[in-house]
């Protein structure tokens, strides 16, 4: 069983290496270069966190997520308070 797993790992590792070395530059798909542009945009050293380097939609989505998380934490605090302090009748 151990030899089978080693053979599978070896076949995957050597195939990927051969495949990348054998492909000429003119046969690389356009999508690869588009992905490289996006990676360069997100890896720029501009002091902004990665989750804020996207578009305005990403920024709004981040702020809405933080706001909803704070509302949820506040709701849990209120629930714990109401359950721990009984109402006076």
Curated annotation (Swiss-Prot):
Entry keyword set: Membrane, Mitochondrion, Mitochondrion inner membrane, Oxidoreductase, Transit peptide, Transmembrane, Transmembrane helix
Main location, first listed in the record: mitochondrion
Pathway: Energy metabolism; oxidative phosphorylation
CC terms in the record's Gene Ontology section: mitochondrial inner membrane; mitochondrion; respiratory chain complex; respiratory chain complex IV
Mitochondrial intermembrane side: 82-89
Transit peptide: 1-31
Ranges annotated as spanning the membrane: 59-81
GO terms, biological process: mitochondrial electron transport, cytochrome c to oxygen; mitochondrial respirasome assembly
Topology of this chain in the membrane: Single-pass membrane protein
GO molecular function, one term: oxidoreductase activity
Mitochondrial matrix topological segments: 32-58
Location within or outside the cell: Mitochondrion inner membrane
Subunit comment: Component of the cytochrome c oxidase (complex IV, CIV), a multisubunit enzyme composed of a catalytic core of 3 subunits and several supernumerary subunits. The complex exists as a monomer or a dimer and forms supercomplexes (SCs) in the inner mitochondrial membrane with ubiquinol-cytochrome c oxidoreductase (cytochrome b-c1 complex, complex III, CIII).
Family affiliation: Belongs to the cytochrome c oxidase VIIa family.
Function: Component of the cytochrome c oxidase, the last enzyme in the mitochondrial electron transport chain which drives oxidative phosphorylation. The respiratory chain contains 3 multisubunit complexes succinate dehydrogenase (complex II, CII), ubiquinol-cytochrome c oxidoreductase (cytochrome b-c1 complex, complex III, CIII) and cytochrome c oxidase (complex IV, CIV), that cooperate to transfer electrons derived from NADH and succinate to molecular oxygen, creating an electrochemical gradient over the inner membrane that drives transmembrane transport and the ATP synthase.
Listed name of the protein: Cytochrome c oxidase subunit 7A, mitochondrial
Organism: Drosophila melanogaster
